[in-house]
């Protein structure tokens, strides 16, 4: 074992003696030298991967580096790295800028702002369905027409996923965030033009605009978590990002029944509806401004080794369609797409039709129907947070996903056979139990998908999961609605139980191929540091201490 300690001052003042280091003849130290095509480094710095020392000394490929300094891996995606001798001429400050692993304090601001405008958009999705019967009376339309105010969110997502996912790769997080929040704001204000019984088409237009905004939102949680958070925080961060969407649904169940009472006078009803629309319009506008001010594209440094590798592997001419083809060749991911769609689709159908089911068993209980929906989502948010923290600690993605899926099935069965007991408190308990697992599953699916598909784009993988959810959501909502109208709520819920049982069985066949975790483990250990804002302008750097494992 040979240990060489490189002195800072000597490396800056003079090159290494020829007897100490000798360059490979294929490597050029001149700034004008050619760059080997197989190596991806900082945009302005690349080197030949084969660097040898003195002829009598062979440097082993496994080189340990001081935790404060990280060296960019080669594009072969192998985690091993080679230390750069002090005699090599390169822009060291630029290399350090791109290779140091740090997490930014801004990361929590970014994820919280995203959660807030995701909350606002989710509220607008469910605000009609939570008081389905009131809007039916106000606009003079059928229950199926009101259901489409919810289902348009699902339908719009399907054709727009691929263009928006491409935009996410092409233009980045900030552009997508601003576009999504702007559309969300616009849709909220358009609805204010629909405060007359004959203006149902206007409220539909506003809802469609909000549904387009949703396409710019749903695929973001796993991408934000990967780009901004460290390896031990990604699952928690993804849960926080999804948390906002779930909280918006919860508020959408709770607030509309309170703000819009079930009264017959159209003018008074229009006044109460306008209050709700003005509130959501003001909130959406404030959040749009907030996104412009605080949302950044990405942190100064990659927050994890896996993200650093992702930067190194990224190419500007990468084929977007080829990425999708690779994903569909991944059997484990295909199974997850199906199982996630079954679970999330059941949740969408249950949320859309909940008011109708509760009113059938408990007439006049619109407010309590909203509270039951609130209970489902609040319990699910706790489930999501607990699952995220557990995944960060245990990394048991397959096992956790399977257990949560099975418990979702159990909760759905219990809810199905207790709804007709005519005890409202029993419905609250069973619905809360169902929500804890059903809603808690949603962020698990996102994170499991990223693990199975790394280093493919998180936006593409999560987008495909959401397409599956929207397709099953439309099918389940229409089918269950028809079953409820013709055969009652029990058979409608049994319909969902059958598909949740199928999803549980398919989940058991998914292999735990955790590629992102392997990338983090196989790469050299790196001490993750909190990025101090005042350090961003500093050019000071530490020189690595290189340990050569073999002579």
From Swiss-Prot:
The protein's name is Choline/ethanolamine transporter FLVCR2
Q: Residues of the signal sequence?
A: none
Q: Does the keyword Membrane apply?
A: yes
Organism this protein belongs to: Mus musculus
Give ranges for the Extracellular compartment: 125-142, 193-199, 260-264, 362-365, 420-422, 487-488
UniProt remark on domains: The N-terminus contains histidine-proline motifs involved in heme binding. Can bind 2 to 3 heme molecules.
Keyword vocabulary terms for this entry: Cell membrane, Endoplasmic reticulum, Membrane, Mitochondrion, Phosphoprotein, Repeat, Transmembrane, Transmembrane helix, Transport
- Residue numbers bearing the Phosphoserine modification: 541
The entry's function note states:
Choline uniporter that specifically mediates choline uptake at the blood-brain-barrier. Responsible for the majority of choline uptake across the blood-brain-barrier from the circulation into the brain. Choline, a nutrient critical for brain development, is a precursor of phosphatidylcholine, as well as betaine. Also mediates transport of ethanolamine. Choline and ethanolamine transport is not coupled with proton transport and is exclusively driven by the choline gradient across the plasma membrane. However, the presence of an inwardly directed proton gradient enhances choline uptake.
TM ranges: 100-124, 143-170, 173-192, 200-228, 234-259, 265-294, 331-361, 366-394, 397-419, 423-452, 461-486, 489-511
Quick one: where's region 8 X 6 AA tandem repeats of P-S-[VSG]-S-[VIAG]-[HDRL]?
Answer: 31-78
Chain spans, region Disordered: 1-87, 519-551
């Amino acid at each position: 074992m040979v240990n060489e300690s490189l002195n800072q001052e000597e490396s800056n003042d003079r090159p290494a003696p020829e007897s100490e280091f000798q360059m490979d003849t294929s490597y050029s130290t001149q700034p004008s030298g050619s760059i080997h095509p197989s190596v991806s480094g900082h945009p302005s710095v690349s080197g030949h991967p084969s660097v040898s020392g003195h002829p009598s000394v062979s440097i082993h490929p496994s080189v340990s580096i001081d935790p404060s300094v990280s060296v960019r891996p080669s594009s072969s995606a192998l985690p091993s790295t080679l230390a750069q001798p002090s005699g090599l001429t390169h822009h060291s400050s630029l290399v350090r800028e791109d290779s140091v692993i740090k997490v930014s304090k801004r990361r929590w601001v970014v994820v919280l702002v995203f959660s807030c405008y995701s909350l606002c958009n989710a509220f607008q999705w469910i605000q009609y369905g939570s008081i389905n019967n009131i809007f039916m009376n106000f606009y003079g339309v059928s229950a199926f027409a009101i259901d489409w105010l919810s289902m348009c969110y699902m339908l719009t997502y399907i054709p727009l996923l691929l263009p928006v996912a491409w935009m996410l790769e092409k233009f980045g997080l900030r552009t997508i965030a601003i576009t999504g929040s702007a559309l969300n704001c616009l849709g909220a204000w358009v609805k204010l033009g629909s405060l007359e019984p004959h203006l149902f088409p206007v409220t539909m237009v506003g809802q469609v605009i909000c549904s387009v905004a949703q396409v710019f939102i749903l695929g973001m949680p796993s991408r934000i978590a990967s780009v901004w958070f460290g390896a031990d925080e990604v699952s928690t961060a993804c849960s926080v990002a999804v948390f906002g969407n779930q909280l918006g649904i919860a508020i959408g169940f709770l607030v509309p029944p309170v703000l819009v009472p079930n009264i017959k006078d159209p003018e008074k009803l229009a006044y109460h509806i306008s209050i709700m629309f003005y509130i959501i319009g003001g909130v959406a506008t404030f959040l749009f401004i907030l996104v412009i001010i605080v949302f950044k594209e990405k942190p100064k440094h990659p927050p994890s080794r896996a993200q650093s590798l992702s930067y190194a592997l990224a190419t500007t001419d990468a084929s977007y369609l080829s990425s999708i083809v690779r994903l569909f060749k991944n059997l484990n991911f295909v199974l997850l797409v199906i199982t996630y769609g079954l679970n999330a689709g059941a949740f969408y159908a249950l949320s859309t039709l909940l008011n109708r089911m509760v009113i059938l068993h408990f007439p006049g209980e619109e407010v309590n129907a909203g509270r039951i929906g609130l209970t489902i989502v609040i319990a699910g948010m706790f489930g999501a947070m607990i699952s995220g923290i557990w995944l960060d600690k245990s990394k048991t993605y397959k096992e956790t996903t399977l257990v949560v899926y099975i418990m979702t099935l159990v909760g759905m069965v219990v809810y199905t056979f207790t709804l007709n007991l005519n005890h409202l408190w029993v419905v609250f308990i069973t619905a809360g139990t169902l929500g804890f697992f059903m809603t808690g599953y949603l962020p698990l699916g996102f994170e499991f998908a990223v693990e199975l598909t790394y280093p493919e784009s998180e936006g593409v993988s999560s987008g495909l999961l959401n397409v599956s959810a929207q397709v099953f959501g439309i099918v389940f909502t229409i089918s269950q609605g028809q079953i409820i109208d013709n055969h009652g709520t029990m058979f409608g819920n049994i319909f969902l139980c059958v598909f949740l049982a199928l999803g549980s069985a398919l989940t058991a066949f998914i292999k735990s191929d955790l590629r992102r975790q392997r990338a983090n483990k196989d790469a050299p250990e790196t001490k993750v540091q909190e990025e101090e804002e005042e350090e961003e302008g500093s050019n000071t750097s530490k020189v690595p201490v290189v340990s050569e494992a073999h002579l």
